[in-house]
């Protein structure tokens, strides 16, 4: 008599975790960090149509890595959740924590109850109301519904270790926008494989066409989300000589 296949609950959870982690690691990296005037999103993303970074609500932003169709479903659901809560109660009742908790509950349920987990990792960013001194807040939500709040930066997707190391070495809380962009791009360039025809010792170069950049700007009175592209972004990118040492001082010359 053939015995039925059996796997322990622990083994099933380990297999699901491994599947999700591998799917996330195959994607390109995203860096989210706080800077002097709000929150900066920098994603390695050559697509102009399929965004990894998005607005959720007035003072809330969203970034994700992994399978696009899965995190796009989450993004849309988050926007609907925020709109319904703001319409039913008050716009001030729509907070990053409430959205992060909703995402965590959804991902946790999918991870434990569905045959396949979502291969995604997301970040919900929030800045204070216009004119307030409330610090920005970052919430990281992983594939299994785990949630963590961060005060400085979040790195997701791809090869994160060298990117995290570069960020820890040079990050400062009071960076201006240009310095923050250069720091994030310089860190991203340390993450991925070397381009074809180059040695591993040669750093990668990410230009405007390979980046998706946006901010939550606390100086904007209502809708704080703004994309940065084209010549405005090109002026902020680090020069090849500067990529080896990202600026450690927000006021350092380029």
From Swiss-Prot:
It holds the Pfam family Proteasome. It comes from the Bacteria. SUPFAM superfamilies: N-terminal nucleophile aminohydrolases (Ntn hydrolases). One of its GO terms (molecular function) is threonine-type endopeptidase activity. GO terms for cellular component: cytoplasm; proteasome core complex, alpha-subunit complex. Transmembrane segments: none annotated. Keywords: Cytoplasm, Proteasome. The formation of the proteasomal ATPase ARC-20S proteasome complex, likely via the docking of the C-termini of ARC into the intersubunit pockets in the alpha-rings, may trigger opening of the gate for substrate entry. Interconversion between the open-gate and close-gate conformations leads to a dynamic regulation of the 20S proteasome proteolysis activity. It is found in: Cytoplasm. InterPro entries: Ntn_hydrolases_N, Proteasome_alpha-type, Proteasome_asu_bac, Proteasome_sua/b. GO terms for biological process: modification-dependent protein catabolic process; proteasomal protein catabolic process. Its main location: cytoplasm. Pathway: Protein degradation; proteasomal Pup-dependent pathway. Residues 234-254 are annotated as: Disordered. Component of the proteasome core, a large protease complex with broad specificity involved in protein degradation. Belongs to the peptidase T1A family. The 20S proteasome core is composed of 14 alpha and 14 beta subunits that assemble into four stacked heptameric rings, resulting in a barrel-shaped structure. The two inner rings, each composed of seven catalytic beta subunits, are sandwiched by two outer rings, each composed of seven alpha subunits. The catalytic chamber with the active sites is on the inside of the barrel. Has a gated structure, the ends of the cylinder being occluded by the N-termini of the alpha-subunits. Is capped by the proteasome-associated ATPase, ARC. This is Proteasome subunit alpha. The gene is prcA.
